[in-house]
Amino acid sequence: MSGKDRINVFPSRMALTLMKARLKGAQKGHSLLKRKADALTLRFRQILGKIIETKTLMGEVMKEATFSLAEAKFVAGDFSEMVLQNVDKAKIRLHTKKDNVAGVTLPVFETYSDGSDTYELTGLSRGGQLVSKCKEVFGKAVRLLVELASLQTAFVTLDEVIKVTNRRVNAIEHVIIPKIQRTLSYISIELDEREREEFYRLKKIQEKKKKQKAIKEKETEIRIARQKNKKSAAPVKTIFETGNDDDLLF
């Protein structure tokens, strides 16, 4: 196993414990990121469906708005200059909210009316009813455009976040976790090899001690046997071998 396939650590019990904790953390992180990716993908598909639905509705509304504008111009004439002269500020304004999906912040755009309606009484003039209808249809189109912009912004944001999250999930699953597992295997093999070497060394030491003990016991037995043989082989002196006895007088 090359050093590139595993983490470069010194094989020890402490390193084994640390790698096990690291593996557990990586597996937990992988699980959390996987759940996050699933939640984001689900919301992504929901937004995609809403975008398709809104675009379809937008096409119908714009078609209706175009016909309404044509009808209003046919009856009331060209009122573009009058509208431009009476505009002082935007009546439809936009504010932004934030939506949180699995830790990802998505902007949400909403429209609201600011001030009174300048053309509230337009319906009383010539062709005013058609102009009011045209205004309502185009107002609906603006609201749909804002909603579509909000959905597409969320769509792009989620698409980028999902790609990043999936890359992280794949990196943890196919690179980090296998690398930690190979490191654990390497440490376990090294520790087992050390234990076998230590067991063999202790076994040899015990065998050597047994041999030395047996040799000492044998030497002790031989020494004791020699001492016994010396005692049994020592000559017994008789009265004839004692040359210094005093003469006896009768």
Curated annotation (Swiss-Prot):
Keywords assigned: Hydrogen ion transport, Ion transport, Transport
GO molecular function term, any single one: proton-transporting ATPase activity, rotational mechanism
Domain of life: Eukaryota
Gene3D superfamilies: 1.10.287.3240
Keyword Chloroplast on entry: no
Quaternary assembly: V-ATPase is a heteromultimeric enzyme made up of two complexes: the ATP-hydrolytic V1 complex and the proton translocation V0 complex. The V1 complex consists of three catalytic AB heterodimers that form a heterohexamer, three peripheral stalks each consisting of EG heterodimers, one central rotor including subunits D and F, and the regulatory subunits C and H. The proton translocation complex V0 consists of the proton transport subunit a, a ring of proteolipid subunits c9c'', rotary subunit d, subunits e and f, and two accessory subunits ATP6AP1/Ac45 and ATP6AP2/PRR.
Similarity comment text for this entry: Belongs to the V-ATPase D subunit family.
Described purpose of this protein according to its UniProt entry: Subunit of the V1 complex of vacuolar(H+)-ATPase (V-ATPase), a multisubunit enzyme composed of a peripheral complex (V1) that hydrolyzes ATP and a membrane integral complex (V0) that translocates protons. V-ATPase is responsible for acidifying and maintaining the pH of intracellular compartments and in some cell types, is targeted to the plasma membrane, where it is responsible for acidifying the extracellular environment.
Protein name (record): V-type proton ATPase subunit D
